[in-house]
Swiss-Prot record:
Belongs to the pyruvate, phosphate/water dikinase regulatory protein family. PSRP subfamily. Keywords: Kinase, Nucleotide-binding, Serine/threonine-protein kinase, Transferase. The keyword Nucleotide-binding applies. ADP binds at residues 149-156. The keyword NAD does not apply. Bifunctional serine/threonine kinase and phosphorylase involved in the regulation of the phosphoenolpyruvate synthase (PEPS) by catalyzing its phosphorylation/dephosphorylation. GO terms for molecular function: ADP binding; ATP binding; phosphotransferase activity, phosphate group as acceptor; protein serine/threonine kinase activity. It catalyses: [pyruvate, water dikinase] + ADP = [pyruvate, water dikinase]-phosphate + AMP + H(+); [pyruvate, water dikinase]-phosphate + phosphate + H(+) = [pyruvate, water dikinase] + diphosphate. InterPro entries: Kinase-pyrophosphorylase, PSRP. This is Putative phosphoenolpyruvate synthase regulatory protein. Pfam families: Kinase-PPPase (PF03618). NCBIfam families: PRK05339.1. PANTHER family: PYRUVATE, PHOSPHATE DIKINASE REGULATORY PROTEIN 1, CHLOROPLASTIC.
Amino acid sequence: MRTAFYISDGTAITAEVFGHALLSLFPVSFNHNTIPFVETEEQAHKVLQQISESFQDTGERPLVFYTIVNVDVRKIISKSVGINYNFLDQFVAPLEKVLGVPSKPEKHRTHSIHETTYDIRIEAVNYALANDDGSNLKDYDEADIILTGVSRSGKTPTSLYLALQYGIKAANYPFTEEDMGDMLKLPPTLRRYKHKLFGLTIAADRLHQIRSERRANSKYASIQQCRMELREVENLYRKEKIPFLNSTKYSIEEISAKILAETGLKRRKY
């Protein structure tokens, strides 16, 4: 199996994002190897050795995605036996021409602790943790969005991703079996914040699978219970005109992006 390397003199997040985005277009499996903080020539030569060993082991030239500011380190990596993709060289020079301004690369700037949005994102993460699963209703005034849905429909990971990636304060509220009764109704606590609500739903068989991993052979995980709860929440969404999304086939990243697109919430990442 071919190996893909993601290399940087910073966190390597940018190299990973670009590289994964490109590789996801192809129905091919890869071994992934991320190497951050390659800041010296000595470290760069060690990375070259890893790339060479991968080539020797697999017989296939590795794919090498890298974003390296240090010119000397970058030159060393560019000599690897792999197929090299230097994102900075490919994109910076054309941008300099268009903008009429030379770039001023700085290590760690992209994902630095010094970026102005760092405190905003950390505050949003703390908010998401404090307002998980309807645990702190008194803070809903601060929420940018309140995700609702049945247990295990993706509310918590989506809330945390929105916070960490975009600085959005996302609370989440679960609808449980006790809420169902004869017919699920919007709780008075939520009605006041109806304009902030966004619903998540999921296919019953997928919910059954997820819950069974947590509590096998329980009523909570039974397909009948899953179908009943999902039917009730989807009826509520339609009745109350709450926008909602079926999360079954989407990653957390995709769910979050779709929520932002539908609600118009502004990212606080940059």
